[in-house]
UniProtKB/Swiss-Prot annotation:
It is a multi-pass membrane protein. The modification Phosphoserine is found at S36. This is Phospholipid-transporting ATPase accessory subunit LEM3. Its main location: membrane. Residues 1-50, 400-414 are annotated as: Required for localization to the plasma membrane. Accessory component of a P4-ATPase flippase complex which catalyzes the hydrolysis of ATP coupled to the transport of glucosylceramide, phosphatidylcholine, phosphatidylethanolamine, and small amounts of phosphatidylserine from the lumenal to the cytosolic leaflet of the cell membrane and ensures the maintenance of asymmetric distribution of phospholipids. Contributes to substrate binding and specificity of the P4-ATPase catalytic subunit. The chain crosses the membrane at residues 75-95, 373-393. Glycans are attached at N113, N240, N256, N279, N298, N332. The lineage of its organism: Eukaryota, Fungi, Dikarya, Ascomycota, Saccharomycotina. Residues 20-52 are annotated as: Disordered.
Length: 414
Protein backbone atom coordinates (compact mmCIF):
# COMPACT_ATOMS: atom_id res chain seq x y z
CA UNK A 1 0.00 0.00 0.00
CA UNK A 2 1.42 3.34 -1.04
CA UNK A 3 1.73 5.88 1.68
CA UNK A 4 -0.19 9.08 0.58
CA UNK A 5 0.11 12.31 2.50
CA UNK A 6 -2.72 14.84 1.97
CA UNK A 7 -0.45 17.73 2.93
CA UNK A 8 1.76 16.97 -0.09
CA UNK A 9 -1.26 17.19 -2.39
CA UNK A 10 -2.01 20.73 -1.24
CA UNK A 11 1.61 21.71 -1.80
CA UNK A 12 1.51 20.37 -5.36
CA UNK A 13 -1.53 22.52 -6.20
CA UNK A 14 0.01 25.61 -4.68
CA UNK A 15 3.13 25.14 -6.82
CA UNK A 16 1.02 24.67 -9.92
CA UNK A 17 -0.91 27.90 -9.34
CA UNK A 18 2.28 29.77 -8.68
CA UNK A 19 3.86 28.46 -11.86
CA UNK A 20 0.89 29.44 -13.92
CA UNK A 21 1.16 33.01 -12.73
CA UNK A 22 4.91 33.09 -13.42
CA UNK A 23 4.56 31.58 -16.88
CA UNK A 24 2.27 34.46 -17.93
CA UNK A 25 -0.92 32.50 -18.18
CA UNK A 26 -2.89 35.40 -16.65
CA UNK A 27 -6.52 34.79 -15.88
CA UNK A 28 -9.09 36.95 -17.64
CA UNK A 29 -9.12 40.42 -16.27
CA UNK A 30 -12.36 41.38 -14.57
CA UNK A 31 -14.36 44.17 -16.16
CA UNK A 32 -14.43 47.44 -14.35
CA UNK A 33 -17.75 47.90 -12.60
CA UNK A 34 -19.28 51.35 -12.06
CA UNK A 35 -20.91 51.53 -8.68
CA UNK A 36 -23.43 54.02 -10.00
CA UNK A 37 -24.99 51.26 -12.06
CA UNK A 38 -26.20 49.65 -8.88
CA UNK A 39 -27.83 52.83 -7.63
CA UNK A 40 -31.60 52.82 -7.91
CA UNK A 41 -33.08 55.22 -10.45
CA UNK A 42 -35.35 57.90 -9.04
CA UNK A 43 -38.87 56.61 -9.44
CA UNK A 44 -41.47 59.29 -10.05
CA UNK A 45 -44.79 58.52 -8.45
CA UNK A 46 -47.58 57.96 -10.96
CA UNK A 47 -50.75 59.75 -10.08
CA UNK A 48 -53.78 57.62 -10.50
CA UNK A 49 -57.28 58.97 -10.76
CA UNK A 50 -59.04 58.63 -7.49
CA UNK A 51 -62.59 59.74 -6.90
CA UNK A 52 -62.39 59.31 -3.20
CA UNK A 53 -63.33 62.48 -1.30
CA UNK A 54 -60.83 64.31 0.83
CA UNK A 55 -60.17 63.11 4.32
CA UNK A 56 -61.95 65.78 6.28
CA UNK A 57 -65.00 65.96 8.46
CA UNK A 58 -67.19 67.59 5.84
CA UNK A 59 -66.58 65.32 2.85
CA UNK A 60 -66.50 62.19 4.99
CA UNK A 61 -69.73 63.23 6.72
CA UNK A 62 -68.29 63.26 10.19
CA UNK A 63 -69.56 66.68 11.21
CA UNK A 64 -71.18 67.00 14.56
CA UNK A 65 -74.91 66.47 14.27
CA UNK A 66 -77.91 66.78 16.51
CA UNK A 67 -80.62 64.18 16.34
CA UNK A 68 -83.41 65.57 18.47
CA UNK A 69 -86.03 63.27 19.84
CA UNK A 70 -89.41 64.72 18.96
CA UNK A 71 -91.65 64.69 21.99
CA UNK A 72 -94.87 66.57 22.72
CA UNK A 73 -92.92 68.91 24.98
CA UNK A 74 -90.77 70.05 22.04
CA UNK A 75 -93.25 69.85 19.14
CA UNK A 76 -96.10 71.75 20.81
CA UNK A 77 -94.10 74.96 21.42
CA UNK A 78 -92.76 74.81 17.87
CA UNK A 79 -96.25 74.60 16.36
CA UNK A 80 -97.46 77.42 18.58
CA UNK A 81 -94.46 79.61 17.70
CA UNK A 82 -95.02 79.13 13.96
CA UNK A 83 -98.74 79.84 14.39
CA UNK A 84 -98.07 83.09 16.24
CA UNK A 85 -95.49 84.28 13.69
CA UNK A 86 -97.72 83.45 10.71
CA UNK A 87 -100.77 85.14 12.22
CA UNK A 88 -98.81 88.30 13.05
CA UNK A 89 -97.25 88.50 9.57
CA UNK A 90 -100.58 87.81 7.86
CA UNK A 91 -102.33 90.41 9.96
CA UNK A 92 -99.69 93.04 9.15
CA UNK A 93 -99.96 92.33 5.42
CA UNK A 94 -103.76 92.58 5.48
CA UNK A 95 -103.60 95.78 7.52
CA UNK A 96 -101.17 97.31 5.02
CA UNK A 97 -103.33 96.24 2.07
CA UNK A 98 -106.48 97.63 3.63
CA UNK A 99 -104.98 101.14 3.48
CA UNK A 100 -104.49 101.05 -0.30
CA UNK A 101 -106.98 103.16 -2.29
CA UNK A 102 -107.77 102.32 -5.89
CA UNK A 103 -109.96 103.36 -8.80
CA UNK A 104 -110.84 100.84 -11.52
CA UNK A 105 -112.89 101.86 -14.57
CA UNK A 106 -113.51 99.76 -17.70
CA UNK A 107 -114.17 101.62 -20.95
CA UNK A 108 -114.10 98.93 -23.67
CA UNK A 109 -117.61 99.82 -24.92
CA UNK A 110 -117.29 103.58 -24.53
CA UNK A 111 -117.50 104.03 -28.30
CA UNK A 112 -120.79 102.14 -28.55
CA UNK A 113 -122.55 102.92 -25.23
CA UNK A 114 -121.39 106.40 -24.24
CA UNK A 115 -123.06 109.42 -25.77
CA UNK A 116 -121.78 112.85 -26.69
CA UNK A 117 -122.97 114.18 -23.32
CA UNK A 118 -121.90 113.15 -19.83
CA UNK A 119 -123.64 110.09 -18.40
CA UNK A 120 -123.01 107.67 -15.55
CA UNK A 121 -120.87 104.65 -16.30
CA UNK A 122 -122.72 101.35 -15.61
CA UNK A 123 -121.97 99.95 -12.15
CA UNK A 124 -120.45 96.74 -13.52
CA UNK A 125 -117.79 98.84 -15.26
CA UNK A 126 -116.19 100.45 -12.21
CA UNK A 127 -115.04 99.82 -8.65
CA UNK A 128 -113.77 102.32 -6.08
CA UNK A 129 -111.99 101.37 -2.86
CA UNK A 130 -111.10 104.08 -0.32
CA UNK A 131 -110.19 102.90 3.15
CA UNK A 132 -111.43 106.11 4.80
CA UNK A 133 -114.70 106.11 2.84
CA UNK A 134 -115.71 102.49 2.63
CA UNK A 135 -119.26 103.27 1.51
CA UNK A 136 -118.22 105.69 -1.22
CA UNK A 137 -120.12 104.85 -4.41
CA UNK A 138 -120.36 108.00 -6.52
CA UNK A 139 -120.52 106.75 -10.09
CA UNK A 140 -117.94 108.03 -12.57
CA UNK A 141 -119.11 109.50 -15.88
CA UNK A 142 -118.08 109.23 -19.48
CA UNK A 143 -118.76 110.68 -22.89
CA UNK A 144 -117.56 109.85 -26.38
CA UNK A 145 -116.06 112.37 -28.78
CA UNK A 146 -116.00 110.94 -32.30
CA UNK A 147 -113.26 111.55 -34.84
CA UNK A 148 -114.86 111.20 -38.26
CA UNK A 149 -111.56 111.81 -40.02
CA UNK A 150 -110.31 108.47 -38.74
CA UNK A 151 -111.10 105.68 -41.21
CA UNK A 152 -110.45 102.99 -38.61
CA UNK A 153 -114.05 102.29 -37.60
CA UNK A 154 -113.39 99.55 -35.00
CA UNK A 155 -111.85 101.98 -32.51
CA UNK A 156 -111.58 105.71 -32.99
CA UNK A 157 -112.31 108.95 -31.22
CA UNK A 158 -111.77 109.88 -27.57
CA UNK A 159 -113.34 108.44 -24.44
CA UNK A 160 -113.50 111.10 -21.75
CA UNK A 161 -113.84 109.80 -18.19
CA UNK A 162 -114.57 111.79 -15.05
CA UNK A 163 -114.18 110.41 -11.54
CA UNK A 164 -113.98 111.82 -8.03
CA UNK A 165 -111.53 110.87 -5.29
CA UNK A 166 -112.97 111.60 -1.82
CA UNK A 167 -109.53 111.60 -0.16
CA UNK A 168 -105.94 112.34 -1.07
CA UNK A 169 -103.77 109.69 -2.69
CA UNK A 170 -100.22 109.84 -1.40
CA UNK A 171 -97.39 109.53 -3.86
CA UNK A 172 -96.29 107.45 -5.60
CA UNK A 173 -99.43 107.51 -7.78
CA UNK A 174 -99.64 104.89 -10.53
CA UNK A 175 -101.90 104.91 -13.59
CA UNK A 176 -102.16 101.48 -15.22
CA UNK A 177 -104.14 100.03 -18.09
CA UNK A 178 -105.93 96.72 -17.61
CA UNK A 179 -106.66 94.09 -20.27
CA UNK A 180 -108.82 91.01 -19.75
CA UNK A 181 -109.30 87.85 -21.84
CA UNK A 182 -106.13 88.59 -23.80
CA UNK A 183 -104.10 85.37 -23.93
CA UNK A 184 -100.60 86.85 -23.98
CA UNK A 185 -99.18 83.63 -22.52
CA UNK A 186 -99.68 81.57 -25.70
CA UNK A 187 -96.46 79.76 -26.61
CA UNK A 188 -96.39 80.94 -30.20
CA UNK A 189 -97.04 84.51 -29.09
CA UNK A 190 -94.38 84.80 -26.38
CA UNK A 191 -91.66 83.48 -28.73
CA UNK A 192 -92.51 85.81 -31.62
CA UNK A 193 -89.92 88.61 -31.44
CA UNK A 194 -86.30 89.29 -32.38
CA UNK A 195 -83.73 89.74 -29.64
CA UNK A 196 -81.26 91.05 -32.24
CA UNK A 197 -83.62 93.86 -33.18
CA UNK A 198 -84.22 94.68 -29.52
CA UNK A 199 -80.45 95.01 -28.99
CA UNK A 200 -80.22 97.44 -31.90
CA UNK A 201 -78.69 95.13 -34.51
CA UNK A 202 -79.65 95.46 -38.18
CA UNK A 203 -80.63 91.80 -38.36
CA UNK A 204 -81.28 90.27 -41.77
CA UNK A 205 -84.51 88.60 -42.83
CA UNK A 206 -82.94 85.16 -42.43
CA UNK A 207 -81.90 86.01 -38.87
CA UNK A 208 -85.31 87.22 -37.70
CA UNK A 209 -87.31 84.60 -39.59
CA UNK A 210 -85.26 81.40 -39.47
CA UNK A 211 -83.79 81.59 -35.98
CA UNK A 212 -84.37 78.49 -33.87
CA UNK A 213 -86.85 78.92 -31.03
CA UNK A 214 -87.34 82.68 -30.81
CA UNK A 215 -88.13 84.23 -34.19
CA UNK A 216 -90.56 86.63 -35.84
CA UNK A 217 -92.77 84.14 -37.63
CA UNK A 218 -95.25 84.86 -39.10
CA UNK A 219 -94.56 88.63 -39.20
CA UNK A 220 -91.04 89.05 -40.56
CA UNK A 221 -91.39 91.17 -43.70
CA UNK A 222 -94.09 92.87 -45.77
CA UNK A 223 -95.13 92.36 -49.37
CA UNK A 224 -92.42 94.76 -50.56
CA UNK A 225 -89.70 92.67 -48.92
CA UNK A 226 -89.01 95.17 -46.12
CA UNK A 227 -88.32 93.77 -42.67
CA UNK A 228 -90.84 94.64 -40.02
CA UNK A 229 -89.33 96.70 -37.23
CA UNK A 230 -90.00 95.66 -34.60
CA UNK A 231 -91.07 92.30 -35.93
CA UNK A 232 -93.16 89.53 -34.40
CA UNK A 233 -96.60 89.08 -32.89
CA UNK A 234 -95.86 90.79 -29.56
CA UNK A 235 -94.78 94.09 -31.08
CA UNK A 236 -97.53 94.00 -33.69
CA UNK A 237 -100.27 93.74 -31.04
CA UNK A 238 -98.91 96.51 -28.81
CA UNK A 239 -101.54 98.35 -26.78
CA UNK A 240 -101.82 101.77 -28.42
CA UNK A 241 -104.64 103.62 -26.68
CA UNK A 242 -103.23 107.05 -25.90
CA UNK A 243 -103.14 108.64 -22.44
CA UNK A 244 -102.41 112.28 -21.56
CA UNK A 245 -99.57 113.44 -19.35
CA UNK A 246 -101.94 114.91 -16.79
CA UNK A 247 -105.21 114.43 -14.93
CA UNK A 248 -107.35 117.46 -15.62
CA UNK A 249 -108.79 119.00 -12.46
CA UNK A 250 -112.42 119.69 -13.38
CA UNK A 251 -112.95 122.27 -10.65
CA UNK A 252 -109.64 124.08 -11.17
CA UNK A 253 -107.90 123.53 -14.50
CA UNK A 254 -104.92 125.54 -13.28
CA UNK A 255 -104.26 122.83 -10.71
CA UNK A 256 -104.00 119.79 -12.97
CA UNK A 257 -102.15 116.74 -11.71
CA UNK A 258 -99.07 116.02 -13.83
CA UNK A 259 -98.05 112.54 -14.94
CA UNK A 260 -95.04 111.17 -16.79
CA UNK A 261 -94.14 108.16 -18.89
CA UNK A 262 -90.55 108.10 -17.62
CA UNK A 263 -89.57 105.64 -14.94
CA UNK A 264 -92.44 103.26 -15.63
CA UNK A 265 -90.23 100.32 -16.58
CA UNK A 266 -87.52 98.23 -14.96
CA UNK A 267 -84.07 99.79 -14.82
CA UNK A 268 -82.54 96.56 -16.13
CA UNK A 269 -84.37 96.93 -19.45
CA UNK A 270 -82.40 100.06 -20.29
CA UNK A 271 -79.36 97.87 -20.90
CA UNK A 272 -81.32 95.49 -23.11
CA UNK A 273 -83.09 97.87 -25.51
CA UNK A 274 -80.90 99.81 -27.93
CA UNK A 275 -81.48 102.26 -30.75
CA UNK A 276 -81.68 100.47 -34.09
CA UNK A 277 -78.97 100.51 -36.75
CA UNK A 278 -81.49 99.99 -39.57
CA UNK A 279 -81.88 102.54 -42.33
CA UNK A 280 -85.49 103.61 -42.80
CA UNK A 281 -85.44 102.23 -46.36
CA UNK A 282 -84.84 98.71 -45.01
CA UNK A 283 -87.76 98.46 -42.63
CA UNK A 284 -91.50 98.93 -42.33
CA UNK A 285 -93.82 99.30 -39.30
CA UNK A 286 -95.84 96.23 -38.25
CA UNK A 287 -99.32 95.92 -39.82
CA UNK A 288 -101.24 96.98 -36.69
CA UNK A 289 -99.11 100.12 -36.35
CA UNK A 290 -100.78 101.64 -39.39
CA UNK A 291 -102.55 104.32 -37.35
CA UNK A 292 -99.28 105.43 -35.75
CA UNK A 293 -97.30 105.37 -39.01
CA UNK A 294 -99.79 105.76 -41.89
CA UNK A 295 -97.00 106.65 -44.35
CA UNK A 296 -94.41 104.23 -43.00
CA UNK A 297 -91.00 105.20 -41.67
CA UNK A 298 -88.86 108.11 -42.76
CA UNK A 299 -85.57 109.62 -41.63
CA UNK A 300 -87.03 111.15 -38.48
CA UNK A 301 -89.83 108.92 -37.18
CA UNK A 302 -88.17 105.53 -36.60
CA UNK A 303 -89.09 104.62 -33.00
CA UNK A 304 -86.25 104.71 -30.50
CA UNK A 305 -87.10 101.71 -28.35
CA UNK A 306 -84.25 102.54 -25.96
CA UNK A 307 -86.32 105.43 -24.56
CA UNK A 308 -89.79 104.08 -25.36
CA UNK A 309 -90.76 102.65 -21.99
CA UNK A 310 -94.38 101.89 -22.94
CA UNK A 311 -93.04 99.56 -25.63
CA UNK A 312 -90.58 97.95 -23.21
CA UNK A 313 -93.42 97.27 -20.78
CA UNK A 314 -95.53 95.69 -23.48
CA UNK A 315 -92.73 93.38 -24.62
CA UNK A 316 -92.90 91.60 -21.26
CA UNK A 317 -95.94 89.30 -21.79
CA UNK A 318 -98.30 88.66 -18.91
CA UNK A 319 -98.56 85.23 -17.33
CA UNK A 320 -102.37 85.23 -17.30
CA UNK A 321 -105.18 86.48 -19.49
CA UNK A 322 -105.61 89.53 -17.25
CA UNK A 323 -102.82 92.07 -17.71
CA UNK A 324 -102.07 95.20 -15.70
CA UNK A 325 -99.27 97.41 -17.01
CA UNK A 326 -98.01 100.78 -15.85
CA UNK A 327 -98.52 103.62 -18.33
CA UNK A 328 -98.13 106.83 -16.26
CA UNK A 329 -96.66 107.72 -12.87
CA UNK A 330 -96.13 110.60 -10.45
CA UNK A 331 -93.50 110.01 -7.79
CA UNK A 332 -93.38 113.49 -6.33
CA UNK A 333 -96.86 114.83 -5.60
CA UNK A 334 -99.91 113.72 -3.66
CA UNK A 335 -103.11 113.49 -5.70
CA UNK A 336 -105.51 115.86 -3.88
CA UNK A 337 -109.12 114.90 -3.37
CA UNK A 338 -111.33 116.21 -6.16
CA UNK A 339 -112.91 115.53 -9.54
CA UNK A 340 -110.57 114.65 -12.41
CA UNK A 341 -110.95 114.02 -16.12
CA UNK A 342 -108.92 111.61 -18.22
CA UNK A 343 -109.08 111.72 -22.04
CA UNK A 344 -108.20 108.38 -23.65
CA UNK A 345 -107.63 108.03 -27.38
CA UNK A 346 -109.28 104.83 -28.62
CA UNK A 347 -107.19 102.71 -30.97
CA UNK A 348 -106.94 99.17 -29.57
CA UNK A 349 -110.01 96.97 -30.30
CA UNK A 350 -111.12 94.33 -27.78
CA UNK A 351 -114.76 93.60 -28.61
CA UNK A 352 -113.71 91.22 -31.40
CA UNK A 353 -112.48 88.70 -28.81
CA UNK A 354 -114.96 89.72 -26.06
CA UNK A 355 -112.16 91.30 -24.09
CA UNK A 356 -112.10 94.21 -21.68
CA UNK A 357 -109.85 97.22 -21.21
CA UNK A 358 -109.78 99.78 -18.45
CA UNK A 359 -107.73 102.04 -16.19
CA UNK A 360 -106.45 101.27 -12.72
CA UNK A 361 -105.37 104.20 -10.54
CA UNK A 362 -103.72 103.54 -7.18
CA UNK A 363 -100.97 104.74 -4.87
CA UNK A 364 -99.88 101.24 -3.86
CA UNK A 365 -97.92 100.38 -0.74
CA UNK A 366 -94.57 98.94 0.29
CA UNK A 367 -96.02 95.51 -0.49
CA UNK A 368 -97.44 96.44 -3.89
CA UNK A 369 -101.06 96.92 -4.91
CA UNK A 370 -104.22 95.96 -3.10
CA UNK A 371 -104.04 92.17 -2.99
CA UNK A 372 -105.03 90.31 0.21
CA UNK A 373 -103.96 86.89 -1.10
CA UNK A 374 -100.57 86.74 0.62
CA UNK A 375 -101.97 87.88 3.96
CA UNK A 376 -104.76 85.30 3.78
CA UNK A 377 -102.24 82.55 3.02
CA UNK A 378 -100.22 83.45 6.11
CA UNK A 379 -103.34 83.48 8.28
CA UNK A 380 -104.43 80.08 6.98
CA UNK A 381 -100.95 78.69 7.63
CA UNK A 382 -101.02 80.04 11.18
CA UNK A 383 -104.47 78.58 11.83
CA UNK A 384 -103.35 75.17 10.54
CA UNK A 385 -100.33 75.18 12.88
CA UNK A 386 -102.53 76.20 15.82
CA UNK A 387 -105.00 73.42 15.00
CA UNK A 388 -102.18 70.87 14.81
CA UNK A 389 -100.91 72.02 18.21
CA UNK A 390 -104.40 71.63 19.70
CA UNK A 391 -104.84 68.14 18.22
CA UNK A 392 -101.42 67.04 19.46
CA UNK A 393 -102.16 68.41 22.93
CA UNK A 394 -105.45 66.51 23.05
CA UNK A 395 -103.82 63.21 22.10
CA UNK A 396 -101.04 63.80 24.59
CA UNK A 397 -103.36 64.52 27.50
CA UNK A 398 -105.99 61.85 26.87
CA UNK A 399 -104.38 59.18 24.73
CA UNK A 400 -100.68 59.21 25.53
CA UNK A 401 -98.55 57.14 27.87
CA UNK A 402 -95.96 58.01 30.43
CA UNK A 403 -92.50 58.64 29.08
CA UNK A 404 -90.09 55.77 29.92
CA UNK A 405 -92.90 53.66 31.34
CA UNK A 406 -91.25 50.29 32.04
CA UNK A 407 -94.59 48.50 32.00
CA UNK A 408 -94.84 49.19 28.26
CA UNK A 409 -91.74 47.15 27.48
CA UNK A 410 -92.54 44.04 25.49
CA UNK A 411 -90.98 41.63 27.98
CA UNK A 412 -92.99 43.18 30.79
CA UNK A 413 -96.29 42.93 28.91
CA UNK A 414 -96.36 39.14 28.73
Amino acid sequence: MVNFDLGQVGEVFRRKDKGAIVSGDNPEEEEDVDASEFEEDEVKPVRTKNRRPKEDAFTQQRLAAINPVLTPRTVLPLYLLIAVVFVIVGGCILAQNSKVDEVTIYYQDCMTNATSSWSDIPSEHWQFVFHKYKTYNTAPQWRFVDDESDDFTKQRGTCQIRFTTPSDMKNNVYLNYVLEKFAANHRRYVLSFSEDQIRGEDASYETVHDATGINCKPLSKNADGKIYYPCGLIANSMFNDTFPLQLTNVGDTSNNYSLTNKGINWESDKKRYKKTKYNYTQIAPPPYWEKMYPDGYNETNIPDIQDWEEFQNWMRPGAFDKITKLIRINKNDTLPAGEYQLDIGLHWPVLEFNGKKGIYLTHGSHLGGRNPFLGIVYLIGGCICAAMALILLTFWLFGGRKIADASSLSWNMK
